Amino acid sequence: MRFTPAIVIAAFCSLAVAAPAAKAIARSPSEAVEDYVIPIDKKRGEAVEDYVIPIDKKRGEAVEDYVIPIDKRGEAVEDYVIPIDKRGEAVEDYVIPIDKKRGEAVEDYVIPIDKRGEAVEDYVIPIDRKRGEAVEDYVIPIDKRGEAVEDYVIPIDKRGEAVEDYVIPIDK
């Protein structure tokens, strides 16, 4: 991927404006964090993210709207750069090798099959012989309440709601 100056500047700006986020989190729980951690430019009264994408003054368009190269057909290059073969199909639709003997896409059977006739991926997760369980079923730490830690590490606020349930901004 080629980094144009516009992309580098936009990335830098987004990093620079994210710095005040830690201070902003201490605000009212009635506001979603996302609603106020994006810095507001006081002169313009706009969220910084609304204008940090460089604007091409000649065209009046956000650079991201046209940095995907446009070819002479007036199409975005990304719309057709997946090579099209003579059959009129995108190469990606059939480049997964086909095993001519089986008539199957190789990806359907390249997962090694063991002598039990099972795909290796079905049982390579280590099995704890004492418990007879796949290790992944219990490596998430269990606390004294008998609950998986992942079930409650999302912070719960005073309303009894998981924080993640309400930090997504709601349009008022």
Curated annotation (Swiss-Prot):
| PTM (free text) | PhomA is processed by several endopeptidases including kexin proteases as well as the cluster-specific S41 family peptidase phomP1 and the oligopeptidase phomG to produce 10 identical copies of the hexapeptide Tyr-Val-Ile-Pro-Ile-Asp, that is further modified to yield phomapsins. The timing and order of proteolysis of the phomA precursor and PTMs are still unknown. Two tyrosinase-like enzymes, phomQ1 and phomQ2, catalyze the chlorination and hydroxylation of Tyr, respectively. PhomYb, is proposed to be involved in the construction of the macrocyclic structure.
Where does the record locate the signal sequence feature? 1-18
Which positions are listed as propeptide? 19-35, 42-50, 57-65, 72-79, 86-93, 100-108, 115-122, 129-137, 144-151, 158-165, 172
Keywords carried by this UniProt record: Repeat, Signal, Virulence
**Could you confirm whether the keyword Ubl conjugation appears in this record?**
no
Please name the pathway: Mycotoxin biosynthesis
Repeat recorded as keyword: yes
Summarize the record's disruption phenotype note: Abolished the production of phomopsin A and does not result in the accumulation of any related metabolites.
Q: Which domain of life is it from?
A: Eukaryota
The entry's function note states: Ribosomally synthesized cyclic peptide phomopsin precursor; part of the gene cluster that mediates the biosynthesis of the phomopsins, a group of hexapeptide mycotoxins which infects lupins and causes lupinosis disease in livestock. The phomA translated product contains a 10-fold repeated peptide embedding the hexapeptide Tyr-Val-Ile-Pro-Ile-Asp, that is converted into phomapsins. After being excised from the precursor peptide by kexin proteases, the core peptides are cyclized and modified post-translationally by enzymes encoded within the corresponding gene cluster.
Name assigned to this protein: Ribosomally synthesized cyclic peptide phomopsin precursor phomA
Q: What is the source species? A: Diaporthe leptostromiformis
Q: Which gene encodes it?
A: phomA
